[in-house]
UniProtKB/Swiss-Prot annotation:
PANTHER family linked: CATABOLIC 3-DEHYDROQUINASE
EC number: 4.2.1.10
UniProt-listed CDD domains: DHQase_II (cd00466)
Assigned keywords, A-Z: Amino-acid biosynthesis, Aromatic amino acid biosynthesis, Lyase
Protein name, UniProt field: 3-dehydroquinate dehydratase
Record-linked PROSITE patterns: DEHYDROQUINASE_II
Single GO BP term: chorismate biosynthetic process
Catalytic activity: 3-dehydroquinate = 3-dehydroshikimate + H2O
Provenance organism: Buchnera aphidicola subsp. Acyrthosiphon pisum (strain APS)
Similarity comment text for this entry: Belongs to the type-II 3-dehydroquinase family.
GO molecular function: 3-dehydroquinate dehydratase activity
Length: 150
């Protein structure tokens, strides 16, 4: 494999509570444990994984803006911001970094208000309803797109 690929993983509000919050929906693996597993996989794929989790929209937007020059791809689980944040949408459009939107649960089989995403139509793809495996599939997809298909 060639050059290292820099990936930014963004986790939105309440994802800091993974492993303890609604485990029947989100599972019992904590965010630190998930990140440890993802970092191992990313390393095997010759990727460098940077991570941010915030419950504050402006913090995520600032991180997206600062990633413009040094990030090749974004994986974003916007959580509740999926359904409300035109500001995150605009930030992603502005930086022109390709991204994959992911959701642990199937947002289309839950409450009606969760079925609209402000990001899906501008993303490279959406992974939802596959649990924490969705994060791993996002890494594999990026590897296929940026490394193996060059």
């Amino acid at each position: 494999m060639k050059n290292n690929i820099n990936i930014l993983l963004i986790n939105g509000p309440n994802l800091n509570l993974l492993g303890t919050r609604e485990t029947e929906i989100y599972g019992d693996i904590t965010l630190p444990d998930l990140l440890k597993n993802l970092e191992k996989r990313a390393k095997k794929l010759n990727m460098s994984l940077k991570h941010i989790q915030s419950n504050a929209e402006h913090v995520l937007i600032d991180k997206i803006h600062s990633s413009r020059k040094n990030i090749n791809y974004i994986i974003i689980n916007p959580a509740a911001f999926t359904h409300t944040s035109i500001a995150i949408r605009d930030a992603l459009i502005a930086v022109e970094i390709p991204f994959i939107e992911i959701h642990i649960s199937n947002i289309y089989s839950r409450e009606d208000f969760r079925s609209h995403s402000w990001l899906s139509d501008i993303s490279q793809g959406v992974i939802c309803g596959l649990g924490l495996d969705g994060y791993h599939w996002a890494l594999e997809t990026i590897s296929n797109r940026l490394i193996h298909l060059k």
